[in-house]
A protein has these predicted regions:
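Short, positively charged and aromatic/hydrophobic N-terminal segments
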Residues: 14-21
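Active-site helix-to-loop segments that bind/position phosphate- or nucleotide-bearing substrates
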Residues: 22-132, 136-137
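Conserved active-site and cofactor/substrate-binding residues in soluble primary-metabolism enzymes
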Residues: 56-59, 63, 146, 150, ...
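Conserved mixed alpha/beta catalytic, RNA-binding, or beta-rich assembly cores of soluble enzyme
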Residues: 108-173
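Short terminal or interdomain "cap/linker" segment that borders an active site or interface and mediates
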Residues: 118, 166-242
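Short cysteine/histidine-rich metal-coordination sites, predominantly Zn2+-binding motifs
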Residues: 247-252
Length: 252
């Protein structure tokens, strides 16, 4: 884990955010890390079946992944809250809504709110490429999705190490299951996301840059089973605002 002295990391209410490798709060910051793009993740987002790929496709994949790595400026932010008996986050005025999130957090007495983004350079690259080369734009989009997944996975791995011997759940994002996408607004308010790491929120609850993720993570004294994830397993699949916009909430 890339962190400074983490003696205060379990203190609720601390707002911890990083821009690239800059620690903004001594003793609590965890580094925003993009250390690679998983080729299988990129292919998954492209919907490619298994088996060998033509040489020209492999070359495009390599070009696209390297371009995303070059342009990305990862940023992350997170904050810890105690969880009350009714599921409310103490002192926040926010209670995550829906049966799915209540069940997901049922063993947890604390909740981490987090957000991550690849930054506007990646967003602008995707927009420019869509206007001139749609085939390359699709590859770049898939590579960027794999990249933001890497950033989130790295943050979660670092948090798991920092909170040990306690246990963390998977990530659970607004719009996933029956957690309303409208509750993005609460995460933005509590984390001060727009000002801190430069993500804006549209009226429909989608984020710009689009390669951004917000999520809740539970903290428990009990080991947490890894739950089935992904669009196909989501009860909101048919009505998902992310999917209709051609993006996802960032869950694998």
């Amino acid at each position: 884990m890339r962190s400074t002295n983490n003696k205060n990391i379990h203190k609720t209410g601390n707002l911890c955010y990083t821009i690239s490798t800059f620690h903004t709060e001594e003793g609590t910051g965890l580094e925003a890390r993009l250390n690679g793009i998983n080729r299988q993740e990129t292919l998954k987002y492209l919907g490619c079946p298994g088996g060998p790929l033509p040489k020209d496709v492999l070359e495009q994949l390599e070009t696209g992944e390297q371009e995303i790595l070059r342009r990305a400026v990862p940023r992350v932010i997170w904050r810890l809250f105690d969880r009350g008996p009714a599921g409310e986050l103490a002192g926040s005025g926010f209670t995550p809504a829906g049966d799915d999130i209540r069940y997901f957090l049922k063993d947890c007495d604390q909740v981490i709110l987090m957000a991550a983004t690849l930054g506007m350079e990646v967003e602008n690259l995707l927009r420019r490429t869509q206007a001139r080369d749609m085939a390359l734009a699709v590859i770049l989009d898939a590579a960027a999705s794999a990249a933001i997944e890497n950033v989130c996975d790295n943050l979660c791995a670092d948090l798991a190490e920092a909170f040990a011997p306690r246990y963390l759940t998977d990530r659970f994002s607004p719009g996933y299951g029956d957690l309303p996408i409208s509750q993005q607004e609460e995460l933005f308010r509590l984390l001060d996301i727009s000002r801190r790491i430069g993500i804006s929120l549209t009226e429909s609850g989608l984020m710009v840059p689009q390669k951004s993720v917000t999520a809740l993570i539970g903290v428990s004294d009990r080991p947490q089973l890894r739950r089935s994830r992904g669009c196909a397993a989501c009860s909101m699949f048919a009505d998902c605002a992310y999917r209709k916009d051609g993006t996802s909430c960032g869950k694998p």
